Amino acid sequence: MQAPPPEHCPGVESENAGKGSACSGCPNQGVCSDPNKKLEDPGKALVVESMKDVKHKLLILSGKGGVGKSTVTSLLTRYLARSNPDSNFGVLDIDICGPSQPRLMGALGESVHQSGYGWSPVGIEDNVCLMSIGFLLGSVDDAIIWRGPKKNGMIRQFLSEVDWGNLDLLLLDTPPGTSDEHLSVVSYLKDDTNPESLRAVMVTTPQEVSLLDVRKEINFCKKQNIPIVGVIENMSSFRCGHCGNTSEIFPAKTGGAVAMCAEMGIPLLGSLPLDQQISKACDSGEDLTTFKNVTSEALEGICSKIMASIS
């Protein structure tokens, strides 16, 4: 019989399974350390129970830092919620060391409350809620210096101990790369009986230095059997507010996201411009989707494709 996992369990998928400091004294240690005896992470059953009313999960991935994953996550959430008022949306910030969503969603200074059903996520709109480790810190300047097992334990708590309620879509803002956080969240959320319930959206900028890492992220999803909804090319162009001319800040010398999507057989969802209004809205936590501009027009097409893919 499996025992409940210790607080900082590295997870059975981790190379530290059965070997970490948290494993000492755990009744499951012998099972986890033996590749021939490994059982399903006992924490997964708790996650499955907690997430049973969350219909769809969408990983926002990139591979490269600085391409705007967090910004795109907040923009998608805001636009989806505004254009689908009868649906409920959640955001989970699993960028443990660099949580950005509290600022982007205008929720700095908010706190998480405990109820009989677990942590209550912070309400952003009537149909949007948010959970981030940023709400658990004493100061926005506090550094989180954690190794993989502790990060994995935090992610497991977010998935199993937060009262998400009934959600039509949960968007997960992820850190760059294919790190412990990615392996952990995929192992908990992937449902072999319903593989379409967990999907991914890739975010890239046009230049090859970003596309190189996004290709790796696409291959990660293929190896993990995670369906990819498509790719969003962020900061694709810049339109001058004075003269109206459009220029490429990050030239697509190898064809940009268009060429990569054709090469790898992945849909291109659309392109978002480098927009000064986005920058201002990110710092202030303002909802940019209330403005009618080139960004909101691009979001309309992107969000329509996302909703169609999960319908």
UniProtKB/Swiss-Prot annotation:
[4Fe-4S] cluster 1 binds at C9, C23, C26, C32. GO terms for biological process: iron-sulfur cluster assembly. Its main location: cytoplasm. Heterotetramer of 2 Nubp1 and 2 Nubp2 chains. [4Fe-4S] cluster 2 binds at C240, C243. Belongs to the Mrp/NBP35 ATP-binding proteins family. NUBP1/NBP35 subfamily. Binds 4 [4Fe-4S] clusters per heterotetramer. Contains two stable clusters in the N-termini of Nubp1 and two labile, bridging clusters between subunits of the Nubp1-Nubp2 heterotetramer. This is Cytosolic Fe-S cluster assembly factor Nubp1 homolog. PANTHER family: CYTOSOLIC FE-S CLUSTER ASSEMBLY FACTOR NUBP1, NUCLEOTIDE-BINDING PROTEIN NBP35 YEAST -RELATED. One of its GO terms (cellular component) is cytosol. SUPFAM superfamilies: P-loop containing nucleoside triphosphate hydrolases. The gene is Nubp1. ATP binds at G63, K64, G65, G66, V67, G68, K69, S70. Keywords: 4Fe-4S, ATP-binding, Cytoplasm, Iron, Iron-sulfur, Metal-binding, Nucleotide-binding. One of its GO terms (molecular function) is ATP binding. Residues 1-20 are annotated as: Disordered. Pfam families: ParA. Its cofactor is [4Fe-4S] cluster. It is found in: Cytoplasm. It comes from Drosophila simulans. Component of the cytosolic iron-sulfur (Fe/S) protein assembly (CIA) machinery. Required for maturation of extramitochondrial Fe-S proteins. The Nubp1-Nubp2 heterotetramer forms a Fe-S scaffold complex, mediating the de novo assembly of an Fe-S cluster and its transfer to target apoproteins.
